[in-house]
Amino acid sequence: MTYVLIPGAGGDPRYWDLLVDELHARGHKAVAVPLPAADPDAALPEYADAVRAVVDTHPEVVLVAQSLGAFTAPLVAAHPAVRLLVLLNPMIPAPGETPGDWWTATGHAEARAAYAAAQGRDPHAGVDLAVDFFHDVPADVAARLIDGPQESDAVFVHPNPLRRWPDVPTRVISGRDDRFFPADFQRRLAVDRLGVHPHELPGGHLLALSQPRLLAETLLNLTG
């Protein structure tokens, strides 16, 4: 079994480096896919092509998708090699929904503001990478990745070709300390859109950086 890892916004495969090391140490194959996120002409079909090219080279695959990667993963999950789809702190799409429409459709802004207020943080503050994403990531790791590649607008505005969720077992893993996609918000979305309850781990939005060992163990438990 090979774990094929789809990054979130920015398409940076380095996000998965620590998890890849943990999976390799346990005797498992893992491949992180670079996405053409900076290409202004690349959107979900091109992202799916990049992932599919990797999946094509492995007989049995677990697809693992971080955040925005949850829009790409279901476009590839019908591939005959895919045995399981795992979504990590995901933007779970509805069929045909674009990533740009997802924010309003899911009530994300309200959920994020409510969680910030409950924690004593400013509910009206703009997105801050250090506060919202890297707050629980070791400083040396954050220093390497916080200024990673940017995402072009194309993926947010171009059509989403997904017409139905693929007939592949799907699991959701969420960080119970995620400040960007709060755990309550993720629970609601996973149940409403997939009919599944997330496996919750301690940690924020970037679990592969803050909890790589625990995440590796969780993935292995999910895949038997």
Show where each model-derived region lies.
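Flexible "cap/lid" loop of the alpha/beta hydrolase fold
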Residues: 78-119, 153-160, 182
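Active-site loop/oxyanion-hole signature of alpha/beta-hydrolase fold enzymes
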Residues: 29-62, 100-108
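Short beta-to-alpha linker loops that shape the active-site pocket of alpha/beta-hydrolase fold enzymes
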Residues: 34-38, 91, 204
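Conserved serine/cysteine hydrolase catalytic core
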Residues: 151-213, 217
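Glycine-rich His-Gly loop
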Residues: 6-9, 67, 90, 175
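Conserved HGGG/HGGXW glycine-rich cap/lid loop of the alpha/beta-hydrolase fold
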Residues: 1-40
